[in-house]
UniProtKB/Swiss-Prot annotation:
PANTHER family reported for this sequence: TRIOSEPHOSPHATE ISOMERASE
Active site: 93 (electrophile), 165 (proton acceptor)
EC number: 5.3.1.1
Source species: Malacoplasma penetrans (strain HF-2)
Family: Belongs to the triosephosphate isomerase family.
Name assigned to this protein: Triosephosphate isomerase
Length: 250
């Protein structure tokens, strides 16, 4: 399967920045033989405009409310995203879990609302430093994954991407080894095989995220269980985004 590179812009970039990004992207990508899929998680205020500016790049949201509509001030529903031509969203990022009281239950509700409507759910899971040091990484990640996928059918699993982001590695420069990540994802796949068919689990796209850059990406991409990367600050620069797309296609 092709590698998938997702740039998560978080709360960065203005409209002019997005235009500049596309100009730089076009300049760099023309020198690359592209053999990877790629998308950008854009701040919600710019989704509509970014879709037009970033032609050729899939644009996704960074969060989506699970209700179709309602009195939820400040939120954007999956149906509003779909109405704007956005067919996917990051869900359950650790920053949402830590700062905005996202729970396993709301992650599950959001995941279901997206996949039921044929939209892509990029579900983030990952352990804290304390959990990592206590050798609880697998238990935490499996528990989050299992809860996120509760009531997701095998047919709907094709619209799910799991992004494993150890919280202790996000923006810190600390990274686990490729083998550590590969072994953990293999264990998660083994458990998922008890709930879904082997073929469905093998087809599930699983990304690594957490201080990914052009120096360490190859180590992750060569692992059999890692199908790409969810990348934050490094991919704010178009040149870097293209570097990872190129590495993902090798």
């Amino acid at each position: 399967m092709k590698k998938l590179i997702i740039a998560n812009w978080k709360m960065f970039k203005t409209l002019n920045d997005i235009k500049t990004f596309k100009e730089e992207f076009d300049k760099n990508i023309k020198n690359v033989k592209v053999n990877a899929d790629y998308s950008v998680g854009v701040p919600s205020i710019y989704l509509n405009q970014a879709k037009e500016i970033l032609k050729g790049i899939k644009v996704i949201a960074q969060d989506a409310h699970f209700k179709n509509e309602g009195a939820y001030t400040g939120n954007i529903s999956w149906s509003q995203l779909k109405d704007c031509g956005i067919d996917g969203s990051i869900i359950g990022h650790s920053e949402r879990r830590q700062m905005f009281n996202e729970t396993d239950e709301t992650v599950n509700l959001k995941t279901i609302s997206l996949v039921e409507n044929n939209m892509q759910a990029v579900v983030c899971v990952g352990e804290t430093l304390e959990e990592y040091e206590a050798n609880k990484s697998f238990d935490v990640v499996w528990n989050q994954t299992k809860k996120a996928l509760a009531n997701v059918s095998e047919a709907q699993l094709k619209n799910v991407v799991i992004a494993y982001e150890p919280v202790w590695a996000i923006g810190t420069g600390k990274v686990p080894t490729g083998k550590e990540v590969d072994d953990l994802i293999q264990k998660v796949r083994d458990e998922l095989s008890k709930l879904y068919s082997k073929q469905a689990v093998e087809s599930l796209v699983v990304l690594y995220g957490g201080s990914v850059n052009d120096k360490n990406a190859e180590e992750f991409f060569k692992q059999k269980n890692i199908n790409g990367a969810l990348v934050g600050s490094f991919c704010l620069k178009a040149e870097n985004f293209v570097k990872l797309i190129e590495l993902g296609g090798n």
